[in-house]
Amino acid sequence: MRIVLITGISGSGKSVALNALEDAGYYCVDNLPPHVLPELARYLAHEGQNRLAVAIDARSSASLDEMPGLIRALSHEHDVRVLFLNASTQALIQRFSETRRRHPLSGSPSHDADVGLLVSLEEAIERERELVAPLAEFGHQIDTSNLRANVLRTWVKRFIEQKNDDLVLMFESFGFKRGVPLDADFMFDVRALPNPYYDHELRPLTGLDQPVVAFLDALPVVHQMLDDIETFLVKWLPHFREDNRSYLTVAIGCTGGQHRSVFLAETLAARLSRQASVIVRHRDAPVAVDASSRLVT
């Protein structure tokens, strides 16, 4: 049986991930007490069900200490995958504020001032981080701080499609002026390359548009940087596989995240698509929603 365990921080998108798995044909259970999982897996296997997805959060805190051993035991009989979702505290506070929902560890509703509520929520978030931290090492980690729901569904789809020993390589373009991606394993600064922004005809375009592609593709220095990054990644990917890494994020940054970083992320994704399962995402470029994150095949 394929068992997908979804865990991480409340507000980071576990419900979105669970719904995506339900759409993919998984039998889904939210907030299942961990000690019940082996019995449920046996029952569903007996009933002919071969795909199970379970969301586990800090409300099961009394049983969280059992999870590492439980995951190891289940892995002897089943194909077990752990998806660990995280997000910045700022993003989580904003999401809870927008949805007007209480954090599961925040206790009873308070009638204090807004600042007091935020402090209480922040404390609950940090407490939950401590509780679920031991599970992070087992999981395929995704930082959802800047992800749209449809992008997260795309990533979950790739996660369940990949072979168990496969490596997912995610190229993310971004702009330094909007901050660096906190979940990047490698970060390459390409601001030294000529900037199409200073060409008035290219300024409103992105690195996905052919005129910008032609501009950058004609520059030898761009290809030198592409070759150097590709050589580095090809050399070290086997070592990450040997270390049982399932996911690697490579961030490519320019000033605004619109031209150079987008072009390099796209080009590197195409070049490395035979080396690993590849996703490309453009965090800051003003591109269509369906182009902001996609699978590369």
Swiss-Prot record:
Amino-acid positions noted as binding ATP in the UniProt annotation, renumbered to this chain: G8, I9, S10, G11, S12, G13, K14, S15
Residues engaged in binding GTP: D57, A58, R59, S60
InterPro entries: P-loop_NTPase, RapZ-like, RapZ-like_N, RapZ_C
Pfam families for this protein: PapZ_C (PF22740), RapZ-like_N (PF03668)
UniProt keyword list: ATP-binding, GTP-binding, Nucleotide-binding
Statement: the UniProt record of this protein carries the keyword Protease: no
GO molecular function: ATP binding; GTP binding
Family per record: Belongs to the RapZ-like family.
Function comment: Displays ATPase and GTPase activities.
PANTHER family: RNASE ADAPTER PROTEIN RAPZ (PTHR30448:SF0)
Protein known as: Nucleotide-binding protein BMA3112
Annotated source species: Burkholderia mallei (strain ATCC 23344)
